[in-house]
Amino acid sequence: MEILKVSAKSSPNSVAGALAGVLRERGAAEIQAIGAGALNQAVKAVAIARGFVAPSGVDLICIPAFTDIQIDGEERTAIKLIVEPR
């Protein structure tokens, strides 16, 4: 599954475009975010991407989960959003 990493500085429109492209190509995607600002941008991106794929008859579901990732040798807890068609 393709992993899209989102930061608090990410543009929701850019992430939404990437998300819609991955969904059309692979059928599902995972978004990773660390922190409240990044999660905010990620959720906005899912809402925008839903608007991008809706005209083709696709509705999206989003499954939130925790995941542990390594950053500079340090383990951090991130939120992952698994996005799939309904």
UniProtKB/Swiss-Prot annotation:
Disulfide bridge partners, by residue number: none
Keywords attached to this entry: Cell cycle, Cell division, Septation, Sporulation
Superkingdom, natural source: Bacteria
Description of what induces expression: Induced early in sporulation under the control of sigma-H.
InterPro entries with a match to the protein in the record: Alba-like_dom_sf, SpoVS
Pfam families the UniProt entry points to: SpoVS
A single GO BP: sporulation resulting in formation of a cellular spore
GO molecular function: nucleic acid binding
Biological role: Interferes with sporulation at an early stage. Seems to play a positive role in allowing cells to progress beyond stage V of sporulation.
Protein's UniProt name: Stage V sporulation protein S
Source organism phylogeny: Bacteria, Bacillati, Bacillota, Bacilli, Bacillales
